[in-house]
């Protein structure tokens, strides 16, 4: 445990950010999973879930949870999956 007041505050702040980042990463994973499942199940309006997943990924990048390249990679892989499934139909 830190003895210096500023370090105690810093540790508390880092813990806050860690929890916030983990929550955002969970949102991204759930959105991608929901979009992929909607595509596989051939649900009506799966495009909306894909759009929502892209939006959540972009938000995570804006908030600094993900590096921009990682966000782009996640979006690209989701698009690739969707296009692959469309071509199979």
UniProtKB/Swiss-Prot annotation:
Organism annotation: Mycoplasmopsis agalactiae (strain NCTC 10123 / CIP 59.7 / PG2) (Mycoplasma agalactiae)
Pfam families assigned: Ribosomal_S20p
Swiss-Prot/TrEMBL keywords: Ribonucleoprotein, Ribosomal protein, RNA-binding, rRNA-binding
Gene3D superfamilies in UniProt: Ribosomal protein S20
Tagged with keyword Ribonucleoprotein: yes
Gene this chain is encoded by: rpsT
Entry GO terms, CC: ribonucleoprotein complex; ribosome
Membrane-traversing stretches: none
Ranges for region Disordered: 68-89
Annotated protein name in UniProt: Small ribosomal subunit protein bS20
GO MF entries: rRNA binding; structural constituent of ribosome
Biological processes annotated in GO: translation
Function: Binds directly to 16S ribosomal RNA.
Residue ranges, compositional bias (Basic and acidic residues): 76-89
Family to which this protein belongs: Belongs to the bacterial ribosomal protein bS20 family.
